[in-house]
């Protein structure tokens, strides 16, 4: 326990917060090019074929990003927008692709939670 004089001289050291999405370099989103689009299986209690893409960002870092929603139009060389946000049951997947931005089309026939999947409001 430091004395008051020691605190006046040195002060308290602030703990450095570790970023959850370091490849974005403090940016909210980054643009990137898909280098590989594939499916992978989740961790133990779950079972599925999750759609993921390996993306080279504009800062040169290559990350694995999750493609949300049902169905997608992404292939190699597609230009995508990447945001932070991990997928709990896919180890090493710490980023999401933004649907409805750049080359990534929005999800078809989606009526609820449309803003998260880049879907326009349906005509009546």
Curated annotation (Swiss-Prot):
GO terms for cellular component: small ribosomal subunit. It holds the Pfam family Ribosom_S12_S23. Residues 111-124 have a biased composition (Basic residues). The modification 3-methylthioaspartic acid is found at residue 89. Keywords: Methylation, Ribonucleoprotein, Ribosomal protein, RNA-binding, rRNA-binding, tRNA-binding. Part of the 30S ribosomal subunit. Contacts proteins S8 and S17. May interact with IF1 in the 30S initiation complex. With S4 and S5 plays an important role in translational accuracy. Interacts with and stabilizes bases of the 16S rRNA that are involved in tRNA selection in the A site and with the mRNA backbone. Located at the interface of the 30S and 50S subunits, it traverses the body of the 30S subunit contacting proteins on the other side and probably holding the rRNA structure together. The combined cluster of proteins S8, S12 and S17 appears to hold together the shoulder and platform of the 30S subunit. PANTHER family: 30S RIBOSOMAL PROTEIN S12 FAMILY MEMBER. This is Small ribosomal subunit protein uS12. It comes from Pelotomaculum thermopropionicum (strain DSM 13744 / JCM 10971 / SI).
